[in-house]
Every structure is written in structure tokens, then in C-alpha cells.
Amino acid sequence: MFDTVCTLPLSADLFAQAIHPKEPIVSVGLASGHVETFRLPSDEVDSDDDQASTSSSRNGRGHIDTMWRTRRHKGSCRCLTFGIDGESLYSAGTDGLVKAAKAETGVVENKIAIPPEKDGSVDAPTVIHALSPQTLLLATDSSALHLYDLRLPFSRVSARPQQSHHPHDDYISSITPLPASDTSTSGFSKQWVSTGGTTLAVTDLRRGVMVRSEDQEEELISSVYVGGLATTGTSRGEKVIVGGSSGVLTLWEKGAWDDQDERIYVQRSGGEGESLETLAMVPDELGRGKMVAVGLGSGGVKFVRIGPNKVVSEVTHDETEGVVGLGFDVEGRMVSGGGQVVKVWHEAVGSGANGASAGEKHMLGDSDEDSDDDDNDDSDDSDGERRRADEAKRKRKKGKGKDRSGGQHVMAFYDLD
């Protein structure tokens, strides 16, 4: 299905990655505090003049443009998310600030101060998610989950969260919104699933924490929602898939949150499982059914078909650095990030008998030029800040990133034809 990989080198370790909901745009947050936004080549043909560039894009030779780059945070940028409409990009850093910027230009429009720890130290962010045009969710190292009203302009008073919860005993590792109910008037989600430590929890926008699962006796790291499954017996055809630290995916039936429903063994190595760091649903038209892409701590990406519940294919993002970011853009291309590299995997144009075709890998080294347009309150890098950035890495630390440009990578889904 995918055969060509474009490799985009970064200037520092990748901590966060966000994909625009409506345009072929990817943003990254780095250990150095920088935030960079790139526009990927489009496969759409608007005129005859675009035919040549479109052909190049499909073969992996399109040009990736740097839209903007700035040192957004003093310390590391821990997490990123686009707003529902894609107009804003929210970043959170170990400087204790959330900044809302125009996605197109990077100009900061609003700031939010993260509530500090009881001793006054920074409570570093772990996950950020725009639930609706009005509500922003922010999780932190202390296990706090803050809800902010985005309609309020910035001030020292309005910067305080409207609600705060503690759905877990440990830091929150993932947030997955549940679809709005059929009776919803806004169409936006009002409930979400979170993972933290060894538990899963469901929180409601109005009612707070509704339920917390039993202790799963392993760390729960990542999560994603999947709907449209077969409805059998008590199953509604909706599940949340959770990735754990032991290489196992667990499936949770919506509405039955006490304990997991099914288990899928994804990665085992030497008797120990590899952590499943990030999950993304493969678009139905590409996966030919329900399929989840799983980013591993070992640097691979595995593809698991839901239903048969088995691994059908895998690719390698990096041989040593774990996959931190994973998702699909509006044109169906997979974007994986980890270490000091982001890779864009294109859909194969002429797949062979096994679903693969020969492809080339291209280094787009001119995309990482510095054009810093820092905020007024940002400062230059210093050794001390870099040390703090290193210390602020997630608890499942994966070592220092390296700029690699290995051999050809081809993705083949052998059982799909």
C-alpha cells in the first residue's frame, strides 16, 4: 500500500507531533523548545501546470516546505495539538506554559499558565487535546487533568482551568475522545478515555470522572477509538484500543470500562514485550477494513487488523529510536516521527502482486533551515536549558536521537489482495 518514504531531518529530538485535520501540514515539538511546521506536497491536481509536481509528489520527490519555525518554549516542547478547525496550534512545554498560535504563521494569540505543583515547581505537561472549539484538555506529570475554556481571552485570572480532575494515580499518558451521542446538539465530544499508570478512566465534561478500570498490572501508554465493527451479542461495534508496556494491545468495549475485552500480542522480544508508544487508525480506504498502526518503542511500526486481531505487516521507522508520533494526513499518507527524523510514507501508485512496488527514499535536507522568529519572552539556548530539556523527557526514555538515513523502506500488506 505504501512504498516510498521521504525523510525529514530535525535539529533536536522529537517530543511531539501533530497532523493538521484539513490540510497536508505536520507540526513537530522538539527537545530544544522549538516548534516547526511543514507543508507536505499535495497530490491534488488543480491545473495542468500542477501535473508535473503532482507526479513527483506521488513518487516521493515532492518538496516539503518549512512554513515557520520558532523557539516556542524555554525548555522542551512536550506536546502539540491542532484545534478542531485546524486554525490554531496549541503547544505545551516544560516552562509551564501553553501557547496558542496561528497554524499558518506561528504567531502566538493566547497563553495559558499550567498550575504548578504544591511546592511551586513546574508540573510538566504530558498530553494536550482540543476537545471542541471551546474546550482544551491538558494532562500533567502529577496526574492532573485540567479543562480550559478557549473562549476566554488571556489574563492572569482567565488562565486558570475551569475544572481539574485526577482520574489516575500516575501521570496521564493518552487521551482519546469518544464520539458525540446521537442526541448531541453541538456534534462535539463531551466524554473521553484516558490512560495513566495501570488504569483506564472515562471522564465527562459535566460530571467529571465517571469510572476507572481495575488495575491492569501493566503500564497503559496509548489509546485510539475504533467504530463500525460488527455488532454481535452485547457488542455495540465500538471499542477503545489501548497499547501497553508489554507489547500487548487490549480492546475495551464501549460502556464496559471495568476491564479489557480482548488481547492482541503485537511485539515480544526475548520473553519481554516492547512498549506500544502510539496508535493511529489506518484510513478505511487504505486498510481495507479496520486496521490500527502501532508505533513501537523499538522503532518499528506494526499494522494490526481488527477482527482477526493479528499483525499483518510492519515497517521500520528507525532501528534504535522509538516512534513518538504516528498518524495519517488528509491525503492518506502515514507520518511517523521519532529520534531526530520524521518520515512520510506515500501510498503506492502501482502495487505489485504482494501489494508493494519499488520505491526511493529522499532526504529533504533543505527543509530544516533556521528562520527563528521567537516570541518576545523567549530566550536563546543555553546549556542549562538543554540539561533541563533532557531531564524533562518522558519516563520511558529512549536514548539520544540520531540523524539517520538508512536504506529503502517498503510497506507491503501481504494478505490484503
UniProtKB/Swiss-Prot annotation:
Gene3D superfamilies referenced in this protein's UniProt entry, alphabetically = YVTN repeat-like/Quinoprotein amine dehydrogenase
The entry's localization annotation reads: Nucleus, Nucleolus
For whether the record's keyword set contains Nucleus, the answer is yes
Comp. bias regions, Acidic residues:
366-383
Report which residue ranges the record marks as coiled coil.
none
Query: Which residue intervals are annotated with compositional bias (Basic and acidic residues) in the record?
Result: 384-393
The residue spans of each WD repeat are 72-111, 117-158, 221-262, 318-355
Assigned GO CC terms: nucleolus
- Classify the main location: nucleus
Q: Which superkingdom?
A: Eukaryota
Q: Which UniProt keywords apply?
A: Nucleus, Repeat, WD repeat
The keyword Transport appears for this protein: no
Stretches for region Disordered:
41-64, 352-417
Which family would the database say this protein is a member of? Belongs to the WD repeat WDR55 family.
Indicate what this protein is called per its UniProt record.
Answer: WD repeat-containing protein jip5
